[in-house]
């Protein structure tokens, strides 16, 4: 029987308890991450475009790490951006700091906004643990 394990990194317990939001769920070797945004542990939106992108990726790293995964295990990436697509170049520069070896599939969307004012991007991904290159 395949098991379902909720992944809650240290510092994200409150969001799980309050909003019933699982940062990730592991089923077998597959890890499904919920969308991560540029908020700190106190749920404050990080100021500055690049800083917010970095924080969103650091939140992804934190969730991956809690499950024993890294960015090399990510096979699918989905990103949602606010209408200001002028920040795409900055996002690409930041993304390439995290994905340096194995590149995932990637789909990007433009949206009007997010549930919290000031959020510029949301990053969701899927990882498979124990992958090897062929």
What kind of region is each of these model predictions?
Residues 1-58, 62-75, 81-134:
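N-terminal presequence-like segments and the immediate start of the first folded domain
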């Amino acid at each position: 029987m395949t098991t379902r394990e909720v992944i809650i990194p240290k510092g994200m317990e409150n969001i799980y308890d309050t909003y019933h939001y699982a940062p990730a769920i592991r089923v077998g070797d597959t890890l499904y991450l919920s969308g991560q945004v540029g908020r700190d542990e106190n749920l404050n939106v990080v100021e500055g475009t690049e800083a917010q992108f970095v924080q969103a990726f650091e939140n992804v790293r934190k969730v991956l790490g809690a499950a024993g995964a890294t960015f090399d295990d990510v096979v699918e990436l989905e990103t949602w951006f606010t209408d200001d697509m002028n920040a795409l170049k900055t996002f690409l520069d930041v993304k390439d700091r995290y994905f340096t070896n194995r590149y995932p599939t990637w789909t990007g969307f433009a949206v009007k906004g997010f549930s919290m004012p000031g959020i510029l991007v949301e990053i969701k991904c899927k990882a498979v643990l124990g992958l090897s290159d062929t």
